[in-house]
């Protein structure tokens, strides 16, 4: 790809956080004159967020559920469908964050593909994507030697400084109507909780009763508090019925909710890192192996490891200026540079 030439970029979005990640990047790509096509998988709040953000997209496939066989069937069918689409559309570049469907589909269609991630221990995903991707983009907290076993080495591997959240949140403006939509009280301590992703492969076999205990602890606290829970699945939503919590009826803009909150407890990674980037106290009850990004945040005091429900400090947070953000153009340049110098 020649610098300055308009290209056709294909973005694949397979999970709710990816809609937030790519929202500003898509806008900036289009502002540069590039044409962007978005494909999406039906899973969690992915499609709802894309609709809320006004991002046109093609829905291709759905999540395969919690079983390995179901995941394999869904992935095979979706990869084949994406490869057919890519051949027909003749994209110049493909990019995704954590998609295991796009890398092989792009390779089959002869399109350079950039894969992004920020958790190095999703071994099945990385062995797979490391084989198919043309380029890999990760935070510099992850050492090169941790990725070599996946076939991810320079020049295929490119690392960027800081958190990805510090880039894509640079343009973010909070939704002014969100507090009223959810019925949040300005006098209450607002806690946002995100349950563990029970169907995710790297959580398989790991129990997280700590999350449920923490939810009970906060709900029963002797202070004026409101708890907003963002379930990942219909089963999680059903399990929350009857509890004294707020469960949004439709997908919400996560960063806007975080900025309205006093603290965040998330068993996944993205919401905690968004909180860290926005200066909001964040706790992780993640029961698996912590990745390098979260370890760095804990060392810096920007993320706290939750070991007991009592560890949560339920108090109003200090509100002031946002922490410093980073220039999203650097991420766009890195994506295009990885594609330009891709080793196939």
Across the structure, where does each feature detected by a protein language model lie?
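A donor-sugar binding/catalytic signature common to diverse glycosyltransferases
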Residues: 94-105, 115-116, 257-294
């Amino acid at each position: 790809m020649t610098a300055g030439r308009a290209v056709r970029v294909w973005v694949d979005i397979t999970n709710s956080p990816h809609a937030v990640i790519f929202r500003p990047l898509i806008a900036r790509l289009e502002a540069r004159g590039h044409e962007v096509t978005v494909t999406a998988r039906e899973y969690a709040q992915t499609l709802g967020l894309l609709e809320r953000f006004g991002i046109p997209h093609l829905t291709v496939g759905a999540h395969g559920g919690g079983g390995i066989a179901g995941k394999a069937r869904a992935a095979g069918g979706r990869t084949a469908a994406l490869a057919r689409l890519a051949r027909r559309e003749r994209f110049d570049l493909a990019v995704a964050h954590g998609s295991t469907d796009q890398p092989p589909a792009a390779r089959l269609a002869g399109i350079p593909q950039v894969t992004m991630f920020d958790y190095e221990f999703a071994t099945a995903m990385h062995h797979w994507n490391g084989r198919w991707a043309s380029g890999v983009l990760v935070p510099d907290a992850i050492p090169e030697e941790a990725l070599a076993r996946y076939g991810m080495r320079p020049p295929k591997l490119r690392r960027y400084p800081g958190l990805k959240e510090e880039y894509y949140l640079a343009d973010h403006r909070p939704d002014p109507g969100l507090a009223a939509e959810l019925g949040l009280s300005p006098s209450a301590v607002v806690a946002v909780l995100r349950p563990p992703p029970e169907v995710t492969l790297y959580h398989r076999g790991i129990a997280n009763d700590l999350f449920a205990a923490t939810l009970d602890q906060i709900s029963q606290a002797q202070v004026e508090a409101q708890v907003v829970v963002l379930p990942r699945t219909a089963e999680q939503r059903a399990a929350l019925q009857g509890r004294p919590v707020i469960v949004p009826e439709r997908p919400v803009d996560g960063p806007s909710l975080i900025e309205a909150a006093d603290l965040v407890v998330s068993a996944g990674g993205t919401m905690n890192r968004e909180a860290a980037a926005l200066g909001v106290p964040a706790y992780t009850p993640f029961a698996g192996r912590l990745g390098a990004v979260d370890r760095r945040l804990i060392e810096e005091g920007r993320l706290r490891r939750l070991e007991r429900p009592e560890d949560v400090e339920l108090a109003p947070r200090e509100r002031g200026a946002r922490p410093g953000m980073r220039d999203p153009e650097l991420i766009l340049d890195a994506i295009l540079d990885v594609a330009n110098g891709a080793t196939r």
